[in-house]
């Protein structure tokens, strides 16, 4: 459920980024996050940075003309401290690194809505046993609901060394904590127990739920390089290593739904959320590069790019599956293994100082997440996006800076994969996925 950037990763570490997303080659008070090797070129002193973001909007799915929507209202704080000396600097940061907040779908999701259509498809297959009547013709899941949360926090501690007047390098260690939650209910309506001629029931039950939390700790390293090619041109690069996260699930699930005596519940489709299950879902490594160029003393432009090594990370590729012996042959319902290509994004930004105390920021960013359609489901759909941002920078004196920014994420709408996943059920349609998110941000930096 990440917004912007790639699969789980975000890049909205600081408020200034949302106004000018081309931060990788800049040297400013946000560089401690994006170009740490460059902070040694700032004025000497100890800096304290505090920021707050508020992301609002919605994420939604559509299935057979019905909309399943969750509103987003997610605050995201960030903190940083760094000390700049003549030939070195120390820095510490804390804040979000991945995830997409808390989303509550009060009317269910596409994955619950499709259950009624799957049952209708099963009913068609059972007609030879039920007097040519579709016993599930009125099956629906009205009253179902779902809530999911994906949040990751990081803290990074590092040092910068100035090699000469042009070149500086940085190295840091990073600690990450991730939490992923799923709380959902499935209510089946218009169904009843169906006896089997061989004893027992062909079908029984009408309710399933899950309440599970997955948590993990991980660590990584961060390496940086900054090169001041000329007085006006600055070049920089940063590498954030893969963070290995072995999530462990803690929770409960229940289902009284059975088909052919085989239980059917959320754990069949989300095995990573079964209590006690351990599944790797890493944060991929990132290679970030950028440049900034002072066109005039008051106007700076920047270009940034990020590359996400998704293929090298393990990312919940387990697919759920059930196989039910039936008189007409085995009934199989199975998930698809999530697939990912590497992701990338490119940003162009500008900063123009129109007075000694005020500057205006602007930028555009395109993100290709690398997520393939097989990865789209109720708990994850990382869509490609274009982001527009702008803001103001206010310096009341030489040691104080306020930043006020706003940005909007325009996401591509994509279709799902039910046509492949449930290919044997003509009653099933394909869902579509979409998002719309706006972020409002403020930060304060003080140099002592």
Model-derived segments and spans:
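N-terminal, post-signal peptide beta-strand-biased segments of exported outer-membrane/organellar beta-barrel
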Residues: 2-105, 381, 407
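Residues on the lipid-exposed face of transmembrane beta-strands in outer-membrane beta-barrel proteins
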Residues: 38, 50, 74-85, 155-161, ...
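Solvent-exposed loop segments that connect transmembrane elements
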Residues: 108-142, 179-212, 247-276, 313-335, ...
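Detector for outer-membrane/organellar transmembrane beta-barrel domains
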Residues: 168, 224-228, 232-248, 278-370
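Outer-membrane beta-barrel "beta-signal"
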Residues: 392, 400, 434-448
């Amino acid at each position: 459920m990440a917004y912007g950037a790639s699969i789980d990763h975000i890049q909205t570490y600081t408020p200034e980024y949302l106004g000018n997303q081309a931060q990788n080659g800049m040297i400013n008070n946000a560089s401690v996050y994006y170009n740490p090797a460059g902070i040694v070129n700032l004025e000497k002193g100890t800096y304290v940075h505090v920021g707050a973001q508020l992301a609002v909007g919605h994420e939604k799915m559509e299935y057979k003309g019905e909309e399943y929507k969750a509103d987003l209202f997610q605050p995201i704080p960030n903190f940083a401290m760094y000390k700049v000396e003549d030939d070195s600097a120390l820095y510490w940061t804390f804040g979000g690194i991945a995830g997409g907040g808390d989303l509550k779908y009060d009317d269910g999701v596409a994955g619950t809505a499709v259950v009624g259509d799957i049952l209708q498809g099963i009913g068609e297959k059972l007609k030879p046993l039920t007097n040519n009547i579709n016993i599930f013709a009125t099956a629906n899941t009205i009253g179902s609901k779902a809530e999911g949360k994906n949040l990751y926090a990081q803290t990074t501690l590092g040092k910068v060394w100035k090699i000469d007047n042009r070149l500086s390098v940085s190295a840091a260690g990073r600690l990450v904590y991730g939490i992923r939650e799923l709380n959902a209910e499935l209510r089946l309506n218009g169904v009843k127990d169906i006896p089997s001629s061989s004893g027992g029931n062909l079908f029984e039950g009408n309710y399933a739920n899950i309440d599970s939390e997955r948590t993990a700790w991980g660590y990584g390293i961060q390496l940086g390089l900054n090169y001041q090619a000329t007085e006006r041109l600055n070049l920089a690069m940063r590498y954030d290593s893969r963070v290995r996260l072995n999530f462990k699930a803690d929770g409960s699930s229940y289902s009284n739904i059975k088909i052919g005596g085989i239980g059917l519940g959320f754990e069949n489709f989300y095995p990573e959320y079964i209590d006690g299950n351990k599944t790797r879902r890493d944060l991929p490594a990132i290679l970030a590069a950028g440049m900034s160029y002072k066109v005039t003393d008051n106007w700076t432009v920047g270009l940034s790019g990020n590359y996400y090594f998704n293929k090298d990370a393990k990312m919940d590729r387990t697919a759920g599956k059930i196989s039910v012996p039936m008189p007409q042959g085995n009934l199989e319902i199975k998930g698809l293994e999530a697939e990912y290509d590497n992701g990338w994004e490119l940003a162009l930004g500008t900063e123009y100082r129109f007075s000694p105390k005020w500057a205006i920021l602007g930028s555009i960013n395109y993100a290709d997440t690398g997520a393939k359609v097989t990865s789209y489901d109720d708990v994850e759909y990382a869509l490609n996006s274009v982001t527009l941002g702008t803001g103001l920078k206010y310096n009341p004196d030489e040691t104080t800076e306020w930043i006020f920014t706003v940005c909007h994420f325009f996401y591509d709408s994509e279709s799902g994969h039910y046509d492949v996943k449930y290919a044997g059920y003509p009653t099933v349609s394909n869902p579509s996925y979409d998002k719309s998110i706006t972020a409002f941000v403020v930060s304060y930096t003080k140099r002592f």
